[in-house]
Amino acid sequence: VNKMYFQHFPEILRPETIISRDEKEIREFFKSQKQKMILKPLNGYGGSGVILIEKRAMSSIRSLLDFYIDNKDGTTNYVILQDYIPGADQGDVRILILNGKPIGAMKRVPGDDDHRSNVSAGGSVQRHTLSKQEKELCRRIGPKLVKDGLYFVGIDVINGMLVEVNVMSPGGVTYIN
């Protein structure tokens, strides 16, 4: 539920995304998108397993899907495939929301030679003041969070687009004043 929840918000607020384990569906989605995509395991955390795929690497997609989806015991895993948001290489913003209202934010910047901005993946943290666009995003999603009983969450935002809602373990409390 954690990583799937953000799909409940309108597409205007988030990048185009699919959650699937069907190779054909994933290939079609990948072909229909721009030049870059983000692939992440549905059950991952802390940036583990999150990779940036460029369209020119399409010939390697079968190998990636074998690794991410197919288990040796014959079972399969779901993956999230998300349209790349320009500017993601500059990091993301983690916003903590309590009772539908933002209580603080931090900018997470990727480490050297990495696209992931998670602190556990080598990213660093900077102070951040919410932009007008980020405040508006919080205003739009806050009521639904409360309605769904999600009183304390961390959302990840890139260029005003919602990329993830962390409902189980919204890290970042210690970094926010």
Regions picked out by a protein language model, each given a short descriptive name:
Residues 129-177:
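ATP-dependent carboxylate activation and anion-phosphoryl transfer catalytic cores
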Residues 1-20, 24-28:
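Conserved N-proximal alpha/beta basic substrate-recognition cap immediately N-terminal to
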Residues 28, 106, 173-176:
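Generic domain-boundary/flexible-linker signal
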